[in-house]
UniProtKB/Swiss-Prot annotation:
Organism field: Helicobacter pylori (strain P12)
GO molecular function, one term: phosphate:acyl-[acyl carrier protein] acyltransferase activity
Subunit structure: Homodimer. Probably interacts with PlsY.
UniProt key word 4Fe-4S: no
Predominant location: cytoplasm
Protein name: Phosphate acyltransferase
Length: 339
């Protein structure tokens, strides 16, 4: 299995990415292709690691402040070169660089799976249960039609079933209330269409994401990104409050010591690094979009995530789902119109 790793554009430079690749290679068998500035990377690559990876040199990359559309023009940029390697035989790509550039190039260079109108970013959210919830779209599509959300539901269902091994995933539609009549026009129209599918649970509220009420939560990219950023902010704020209170007295420090294991589990469940990255679903190869602030652990987990996606053949599963399941939407709509 060959995995392409974009070294450029992350907030903390190349070091955490190289460390993450090194750790993953200690635990999994795969071929790593590093794309980026060789001069910046070489000081951090040991002789042992150098023997296990292939290095493709380029100094160009799409900066965060640049428009995503720059990517298609910059054929020597790290993400363009990486996407070409993926298109021409590699199995997966991971990038912690410009997410818009990654999404745009993946769509243009790899192509969409037949039947998919818009690819979506799929992210894992912590829940009170033993397994996380899947949220999509987490930011790829700000403005959506109901048909796009149907695509997201199908892709999220297949990802949960194939990659996460959830037996019969339940899919919920994010709304401002669980009643069928709640929601804006987009939610109401999507709800009607999703009723055609056995996996559809119904509307869910924001709090249900973390209760594990459903396995997959579907929404437009604007709402999904707000949910994601709010979750990150709340988790960070709670962590800071805990630290301040623990340091406030000797009694608090002793109590924290007794709860060390519980705090460790809480941190693991709420730490974005443990989830790796966010798969871009709907394109013809596995692409993982990692957080710009990714540390070595996040890159390591993103690689494991990519390996799971490839081994589970999730792109093929989504293709098959669109061939067999999506036509039922048009049938359902026709039935409604006839009625």
């Amino acid at each position: 299995m060959k995995i392409v790793i974009d070294l450029m554009g992350a907030d903390h430079g190349v070091l955490p990415i190289i460390e993450g690749v090194s750790r993953a290679l200690e635990n999994k068998s795969f071929s790593a292709v590093l794309v980026g500035d060789k001069d910046k990377a070489t000081p951090f690559i040991s002789k042992e690691l150098a023997s296990k990876v292939e290095m493709i040199h380029t100094q160009d990359y799409i900066k965060m402040e640049e428009a995503a559309t720059e990517a298609i023009k910059r054929k020597e940029s790290s993400i363009y070169l990486g996407m070409d390697i993926l298109k021409n035989g590699a199995d997966a790509l991971i990038s912690a660089g410009h997410s818009g550039a990654t999404m745009g190039l993946a769509t243009l260079r790899l192509g969409r799976i037949k039947g998919v109108e818009r690819p979506a970013i799929c992210t894992l959210m912590p829940s009170v249960g033993k397994r996380p919830s899947v949220l999509l779209d987490a930011g790829a599509n700000t403005d959506c039609k109901p048909e796009y959300l149907i695509d997201f539901a199908l892709m999220g269902y297949e990802y949960a079933k194939s990659v996460l091994h959830y037996d019969i995933p339940k899919v919920g539609l994010l709304s401002n209330g669980e009643e069928d009549i709640k929601g804006n026009m987009l939610v109401k129209e999507t709800h009607k269409m999703l009723k055609a599918y056995d996996f559809f649970y119904g509307n869910v509220e924001g709090s249900d994401i973390f209760k594990g009420v459903v396995d997959v939560v579907v929404c437009d990219g604007f709402m999904g990104n707000v949910v994601l950023k709010t979750t990150e902010g709340v988790a960070s704020a709670i962590g800071s409050i805990f630290k301040d209170e623990i340091k406030s007295s000797f009694k608090s420090k002793m109590g924290a010591l007794m709860l060390k294991n519980a705090f460790g589990i809480l941190k693991q469940k709420t730490d974005y690094a443990e989830y790796g990255g966010a798969p871009l679903l709907g394109v013809n190869k596995s692409v993982i979009i990692s957080h710009g602030k990714s540390n070595a652990r996040a890159i390591e987990c993103a690689i494991y995530q990519a390996i799971s996606a490839v081994e589970s053949q999730v792109c093929l599963r989504i293709t098959q789902a669109f061939e067999s399941l999506k036509p039922s939407v048009s049938v359902h709509q026709s039935d409604q119109q006839d009625a």
